[in-house]
Amino acid sequence: MANNTAAVFTRHYDSPMGRILLAADEIGLRGLWFDGQKYFARDLPEKRIEQETHALAEARRWLDVYFTGKEPDFLPPLHPIGSAFRQAVWTVLLQIPYGQTTTYGEIARQLAGTAGLSRMSAQAVGGAVGHNEISIIIPCHRVVGTSGSLTGYAGGIERKVKLLELERADMTGFFVPKKGTAL
């Protein structure tokens, strides 16, 4: 659940893939959304302060490096807001190497093992991945369906493909599904 009592600062970033809204509080970056994407800034308070902060400046610097096709060697201060389960999924996303991909099922297996469970739902993982509010930096675009389907990116499948191409990920066997978002 979002903490809507903290002051939220915002800045825009013009990327090669479209305009991005960045949001941060005093702790770190809370959101990074392409204008108009699914779940766009939905948990932010209406009253926002358009002002640069350390976290926003670092996020902009990170994006500058990233959009040149290079892997940034630092992370801006992050403050993703979500349940313990979502936080666990987002932590796994941060471990996916630049230019590589994993599946929803593999993340589910990893989390199940860590929690001492025999199994975990890939669909539950997909829900947490889909609600990542710090896209690109917390790289939800690096998660694909088990069959290679490029599904479930709130910024749009076309952007997901472009982000993976920018990272020079091996796209062999990947495809855009005709409909649905099966994991």
Predicted features along the sequence, with ranges:
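Nucleic acid-binding interface residues in structured DNA/RNA-binding domains
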Residues: 7-19, 70-183
